[in-house]
Amino acid sequence: AVNRGFGGDTLNTSVYIARQTDASALSVHYVTALGTDAFSQQMLDSWQQENVNTDLIQRMADRLPGLYYIETDDTGERTFYYWRNEAAAKFWLESDRAAAICEELATFDYLYLSGI
């Protein structure tokens, strides 16, 4: 059986922090870029249900999200397959909103960063 989920180091961290904090006391934002496709929308909807603020996520009509697939063998060993060379997240700094998003991030108390 194939199970679909959304994850990655920065998203997992954002979701875990959002789950452990009072949303009125701490706003957890996630910054990335996604496409305008239905799969990207499902990702956004899922993150919003976890109380992760998605206002700073850019949508790129000509891009799709990066994907990875994890295969687990009978002993529990995992093998990872990645498709992210053309992922929207790889290009978000080239967008028109990038400078404004960076300025807004400069006002945040804490940042957790990662990259591909």
Label the predicted regions.
Residues 13-26:
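A short, Lys/Arg-enriched amphipathic alpha-helix followed by its capping loop at the start of a domain
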